[in-house]
């Protein structure tokens, strides 16, 4: 596998001063980098039965469908409100300064479906935790939460306690 960290551009003071942004577009444009991410996630989850890979808007949509294909599973998008055409279930969750809402089609996850949740980044864990609650409320079983990058200093993994959490890359600042 290529050195994935070397393919990620670090952008200081984006989107606001004091934030160091990890830009994955440089990793995505490199075929070995993109393949390395999908292969790394696939290798971790290959021995777990996965019915559905759920991708969180927006960058989770980049990785989740490719991983679903690699695992022989289906793909379900979780989106911001009013982006899906059929009847949806929704969850509103707390952010540091307010709330946010996620939706998925009501018929997307069946009772007992084994669901792997995928996103590009684990920060505080709020969005991933909300997605896991949505899956469980729909009768699904969360078999794991997979991320390309984990910002360990934000302790999102602790918020997801009780779930199998895996990240390919960890940053401590």
UniProtKB/Swiss-Prot annotation:
Biological process terms in GO annotation: adenine salvage; AMP salvage; purine ribonucleoside salvage
Leading EC class: transferase
Keywords: Cytoplasm, Glycosyltransferase, Purine salvage, Transferase
InterPro entries, per the entry: Ade_phspho_trans (IPR005764), PRibTrfase_dom (IPR000836), PRTase-like (IPR029057), UPRTase/APRTase (IPR050054)
Assigned GO CC terms: cytoplasm
Superkingdom to which the source organism belongs: Bacteria
Pathway of action: Purine metabolism; AMP biosynthesis via salvage pathway; AMP from adenine: step 1/1
Catalytic activity entry: AMP + diphosphate = 5-phospho-alpha-D-ribose 1-diphosphate + adenine
GO molecular function: adenine binding; adenine phosphoribosyltransferase activity; AMP binding
Pfam families named among the record's database cross-references: Pribosyltran
Residue runs in coiled coils: none
Subcellular location: Cytoplasm
EC number: 2.4.2.7
PANTHER family per record: ADENINE PHOSPHORIBOSYLTRANSFERASE (PTHR32315:SF3)
Function, as annotated: Catalyzes a salvage reaction resulting in the formation of AMP, that is energically less costly than de novo synthesis.
Binding partners and assembly: Homodimer.
Record-linked HAMAP family: Aden_phosphoribosyltr
Family statement: Belongs to the purine/pyrimidine phosphoribosyltransferase family.
Record-given protein name: Adenine phosphoribosyltransferase
Lineage: Bacteria, Pseudomonadati, Acidobacteriota, Terriglobia, Bryobacterales
């Amino acid at each position: 596998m290529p050195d994935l960290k070397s393919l990620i551009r670090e952008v200081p003071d984006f989107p606001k001063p004091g934030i160091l942004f990890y830009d994955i577009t440089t990793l995505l444009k490199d075929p070995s980098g993109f393949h390395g991410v999908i292969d790394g996630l696939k290798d971790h989850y290959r021995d777990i039965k996965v019915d559905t890979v759920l991708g969180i808007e927006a960058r989770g949509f980049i990785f989740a469908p490719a991983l679903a294909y690699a695992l022989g599973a289906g793909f379900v998008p979780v989106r911001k409100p009013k982006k899906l055409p059929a009847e949806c279930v929704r969850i509103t969750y707390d952010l540091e300064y307010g709330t946010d809402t996620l939706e998925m089609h009501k018929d997307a996850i069946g009772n007992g479906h084994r669901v792997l949740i995928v996103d590009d980044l684990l920060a505080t864990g709020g969005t991933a935790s909300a997605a896991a609650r949505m899956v469980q409320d729909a009768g699904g079983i969360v078999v794991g939460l997979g991320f390309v990058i984990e910002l360990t200093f934000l302790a999102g993994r602790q918020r997801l306690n009780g779930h199998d959490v895996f990240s390919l890359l960890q940053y401590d600042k």
